[in-house]
Amino acid sequence: MKNTGKRIDLIANRKPQXQRVLYELRDRLKRNQFILNXTNPDIVISIGGDGMLLSAFHKYENQLDKVRFIGLHTGHLGFYTDYRDFELDKLVTNLQLDTGARVSYPVLNVKVFLENGEVKIFRALNEASIRRSDRTMVADIVINGVPFERFRGDGLTVSTPTGSTAYNKSLGGAVLHPTIEALQLTEIASLNNRVYRTLGSSIIVPKKDKIELIPTRNDYHTISVDNSVYSFRNIERIEYQIDHHKIHFVATPSHTSFWNRVKDAFIGEVDE
């Protein structure tokens, strides 16, 4: 029995190829009695690349328990995409057979406490990074209320398991499987000499642990959350934890395993 009637939102970038796929997929979904709904969807399909999936995530980050995501790539296979632009019929068929099954990944919760009492709350699917605007950043790192180290360097990034393959990996961090619900704190160009020392390697903390960053100066710091950038002054502290909510993807026969994604992105075919 065909499973139609689901509410679906399509989100695409403005590139001509993505717009062409958007038009074609919209037509196929309508012909198969799916409902296009941009307000209260059951499924969100991003068309483009991983950056577009991040945008879709942030559009619906306050409805994570109600929606599932599908990534449709118009270029090379990405970490969050299961379909290519020439697989529209396959995608529609799998949607018709969808049972509601899902694959879930952890999300990062970030709280920025300002000295005036304001609290800014963000969610990140990949990572959140902090840098000082114009000079060396100095910040105390506290884990579960216990002082760990004083960091000096360009900045720090905290990543999710799925985000461990992004900026974190380029900094020399470890790649974590998303079933490991943990956060990874990675240094950005730390200052290490006879006077100043840091651990010099990534720190991986389990689900229930909390990482706090306490800047020692009250000037401007730049905080990036996935593909968005913010500037704050007079930061009292920043708290990082695994969020209570997860992102859910539609589980289909086309869902690519995590290690296959890693292999495709960084290794490719291995010669025997």
Swiss-Prot record:
InterPro entries: ATP-NAD_kinase_N, ATP-NAD_kinase_PpnK-typ_C, NAD/diacylglycerol_kinase_sf, NADK
Gene Ontology BP annotations: NAD metabolic process; NADP biosynthetic process
MF GO annotations: ATP binding; metal ion binding; NAD binding; NAD+ kinase activity
Active site: D50 (proton acceptor)
Keyword Cell cycle found: no
Any single Pfam family the record assigns to this protein: NAD_kinase_C
Localization (cell): Cytoplasm
Enzyme Commission number(s) of this protein: 2.7.1.23
Residues binding NAD(+): D50, G51, N126, E127, R152, D154, T165, A166, Y167, N168, K169, S170, A189
Reactions this protein catalyses: NAD(+) + ATP = ADP + NADP(+) + H(+)
Recorded GO CC terms: cytoplasm
Family matches, as Gene3D superfamilies: Probable inorganic polyphosphate/atp-NAD kinase, domain 1, Probable inorganic polyphosphate/atp-NAD kinase, domain 2
Keywords: ATP-binding, Cytoplasm, Kinase, NAD, NADP, Nucleotide-binding, Transferase
Tree of life domain: Bacteria
Cofactor(s) the protein requires to work: a divalent metal cation
SUPFAM superfamilies assigned to the protein according to its UniProt record, in alphabetical order: NAD kinase/diacylglycerol kinase-like
Protein's job: Involved in the regulation of the intracellular balance of NAD and NADP, and is a key enzyme in the biosynthesis of NADP. Catalyzes specifically the phosphorylation on 2'-hydroxyl of the adenosine moiety of NAD to yield NADP.
Family assignment from sequence similarity: Belongs to the NAD kinase family.
NCBIfam families documented for this protein: PRK04885.1
HAMAP family per record: NAD_kinase (MF_00361)
Name of the protein this chain belongs to: NAD kinase
